[in-house]
């Protein structure tokens, strides 16, 4: 099964580099040189091998092997990028999850009160932060003191909110 790992938002320069907004985890592995990515453009699957990767202003800057000119890549702006979900170089440790398993999960507090659903995840360096959409939008740190249970199979998460977290 493949998962969406990003979207091409623009080009950069004239040598075929693209700007990718990632919506995936493990980007250090998924976007490393030599990895094969599938770009879906006009319902066609186009496979590209990553030639280079760097991060600039929160976006992933990629070049693909065989693409050396902006004209060869510009038409792909807005296209989604996919990769196989179960990547051979990614080993999940205990309490690690694929973003695609967490996004969409219903979130409840430890009293079983519904809070909302996970709509996005972003990395802060220290820990991931889950964006929960309910009556309001909440930012929930993925730390053991807050997230008590993750049931991927039933798409359910239990948290113990620290004081002020849901205000």
Curated annotation (Swiss-Prot):
It holds the Pfam family PRC_RimM. Coiled coil: none annotated. It is found in: Cytoplasm. One of its GO terms (biological process) is maturation of SSU-rRNA. Belongs to the RimM family. The PRC barrel domain binds ribosomal protein uS19. This is Ribosome maturation factor RimM. It comes from Staphylococcus aureus (strain NCTC 8325 / PS 47). The lineage of its organism: Bacteria, Bacillati, Bacillota, Bacilli, Bacillales. The gene is rimM.
């Amino acid at each position: 099964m493949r998962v969406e790992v990003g979207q091409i938002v623009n080009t950069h320069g004239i040598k075929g580099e693209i700007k990718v907004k990632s919506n995936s985890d493990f980007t250090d592995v998924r976007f490393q040189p030599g990895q094969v990515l599938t770009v879906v453009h006009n319902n066609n699957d186009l496979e590209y091998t990553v030639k280079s990767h760097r991060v600039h202003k929160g976006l992933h800057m990629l070049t693909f092997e065989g693409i050396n000119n902006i004209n060869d890549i510009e038409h792909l702006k807005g296209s989604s990028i996919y990769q196989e979900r179960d990547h051979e170089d990614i080993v999940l440790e205990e309490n690690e999850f694929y973003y695609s398993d967490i996004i969409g999960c219903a979130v409840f507090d430890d009293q079983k009160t519904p809070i909302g659903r996970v709509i996005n995840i972003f990395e802060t360096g220290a820990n991931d932060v889950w964006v929960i959409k309910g009556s309001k939008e909440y930012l929930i740190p993925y730390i053991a003191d807050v997230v008590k249970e993750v049931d991927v199979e039933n798409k359910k998460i239990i948290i113990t909110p620290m004081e002020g977290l849901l205000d």
